[in-house]
Amino acid sequence: MARWDNARNGDLYRNMIEKIKAAGGVRAILWYQGCADADAKNAAQYAESFARMVKDTRRDLGEEIPFFTMQPNRYETQPDAASWGIKEIQRRSALTLEKVHILPNAGLPLSDEIHNSSAGNVTLGQMLARQVHGTLNGGLPFEAPDIKNVQLENGNIRLSFRHVSAFTRLRPLHDAADFCLTDDLGKNEIQSVSVQEKDLLLTTARSVQGKGYLSYGAHPQGPEGAIVNQQTYLPIISFDHVEVSK
């Protein structure tokens, strides 16, 4: 990210601005970056650097140009799950910055341990095309389910989301493995995930003790992306360390 941040290195940023101006401008910017910053040191600076790049781009191009961002896929040999909080930083950036959108990148095929395959990139391009069309040209909305609330309910945990008409499962996988719940006693195993129209209901191995925090797909190997919105077939946007309300 440092090479895209004018306050740090910024060489790639300056090259981008030069090429956009030479081409006469663009209607939007597609942003797919983050794997190189999936470590504790770089991730800590990512939110500030990305926000500064968006601000600088709009200033230098003289318009409130929209950004369409994508979370990283997965890193099959990366053991440090904590570093992949970068996905949560990207999710929150789309919530807090004007005209910044985000798509998940769950379950797409890889060509190696980290990079999308050609087939994966084609699928990602199709998703982006639909989102850009829906946003810029007045087409059908194409936003992925995004966590809105995590609430204790009769000993279970109910999840509600933005941008969902109803959930469905594409295939019978072990969805519980994509979630991680921690509380004052440490890890609390998710035993099952049930679809309840627009919500998901999680059952846990024990009651939540003290403060609880839930993550989904924030680990390097996931998520599978088997639970999708029926209308768009988009999977849930990965989130990390969202507090459980009581």
What are these regions (language model features)?
Residues 1-246:
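Cell-envelope and extracellular/periplasmic
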